[in-house]
A protein has these predicted regions:
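DNA-binding interface regions
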Residues: 1-204
C-alpha cells in the first residue's frame, strides 16, 4: 500500500530567527506545482530592512480553499511567529479573505492587518469594468499618499462611472489605498515578493 500526504508545511530555523529582524510585513500567495504531482505550493515571504526578499514559510496542499489557507496561516502563527502588528498582503481570493478575519487564527486586528495586492485589485477591476482609463485612475488612487488627492481621484472615477466608484467603496480603503494604510504595509503594494518564487516549482 502506498502512503502519501495531503499537506506538508515547512520553515527553516534560520528563516524563523531572521524574521525577528525583518519588517512587520508578509506577502502570501499560492502556485501550482509543475510535474506529475497535482499540488499547490503556498508561500509566505518577508521583507528585510534593506527591502530584500526574505523567504519564510512554505506548504504543499491539494488546493486553495478556506481550510488550506486557514491551516497554512495557523502553522505560521503556531510554528513561525507570534509577533503582533503584522501586515499580510495577499490577493483577493475569498479563502484568504475569510481566514484573515477569523479571530481564532490570530490574523485579525490588532494581531495583524490585511492589505490587498494592487495588481490583483486592478486585475479584478478589469474583469468587472474593462476600462483601461479607469484602471489607470485606480492605480493612481492606490499609490496616492495624500487623502485630499485620493478623494479627488475617486471623485473623477465616480463622474466617469458611478458603478466603478460603488465597487471600490465596497472595499475598505485601508486595504488597498496607501493614503489610508496607516503605515502598515511599508509601501509594499504587491505580492511580487511571493510571485518571484512562483517559478521555482517549475524545476520540481
Amino acid at each position: 500500500m502506498k502512503s502519501y500526504f495531503n499537506e506538508f508545511f515547512w520553515a527553516f530555523h534560520p528563516s524563523i530567527e531572521g524574521f525577528k529582524h525583518c519588517r512587520l510585513v508578509l506577502t502570501i500567495d499560492g502556485t501550482h506545482l509543475y510535474g506529475k504531482y497535482n499540488k499547490i505550493v503556498m508561500i509566505a515571504m518577508g521583507c528585510d530592512r534593506n527591502n530584500q526578499f526574505f523567504p519564510l514559510a512554505f506548504a504543499l496542499t491539494d488546493g486553495e480553499n478556506v481550510e488550506s489557507w486557514g491551516w497554512f496561516l495557523a502553522c505560521i502563527r503556531n510554528r513561525v511567529t507570534q509577533m503582533r502588528d503584522l501586515c499580510v498582503i495577499s490577493n483577493c481570493y475569498p479563502g484568504i479573505m475569510v481566514v484573515l478575519v477569523d479571530v481564532y487564527l490570530g490574523w485579525s486586528k490588532p494581531n495583524a492587518y490585511h492589505r490587498i495586492c494592487m495588481h490583483h485589485l486592478a486585475s479584478n477591476f478589469m474583469t468587472h469594468f474593462k476600462d483601461k482609463c479607469l484602471k489607470q485612475l485606480l492605480c493612481r488612487a492606490t499609490l496616492e499618499t495624500k487623502i485630499e488627492k485620493f478623494n479627488m481621484l475617486m471623485d473623477t472615477i465616480g463622474r466617469i462611472n458611478q458603478d466603478t466608484l460603488n465597487w471600490l467603496e465596497a472595499i475598505l480603503f485601508e486595504k488597498w489605498a496607501l493614503s489610508h494604510d496607516g503605515c502598515q504595509r511599508y509601501d509594499i503594494m504587491t505580492t511580487n515578493m511571493s510571485k518571484v518564487f512562483n517559478s521555482v516549482p517549475k524545476g520540481a
